[in-house]
Amino acid sequence: MSTLSSMYKPVQLPIKYSTASPSLRRSARNQYISEQKGLCAHCNTPLSVIPQHLIDEFPINSSLFPKGMFDYAIHLHHCHDTDLTIGAVHCQCNAILWQYFNE
């Protein structure tokens, strides 16, 4: 039986987000998910469920985000100052981090 950690080649984290290929971003996201034991790096709840408690506390204005922003449930969060990845987060947490905390 294959586990998530055996399905991708480990990468040296963090990675530079803007210069990483889609496949490197995917590998990094998968590695973060594994290292975070399936929990969101922001809200610490399982990445398999929508973080409704945060959405209720911080309503998301979807018009602020590009089309397709919410097409993928798990995002690779990165620092906009250093361009280095931080961890895997819910797409909603990524939106909240940007909209409310300029991350």
Where are these regions (language model features)?
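Short intrinsically disordered terminal tails
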Residues: 1-3
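General structural signal for secondary-structure boundaries
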Residues: 22-26, 90, 101-103
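Short, charged surface segments at domain edges that flank catalytic/cofactor-binding sites
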Residues: 6-39
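Histidine-centered nuclease catalytic patch
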Residues: 42-89, 97, 101
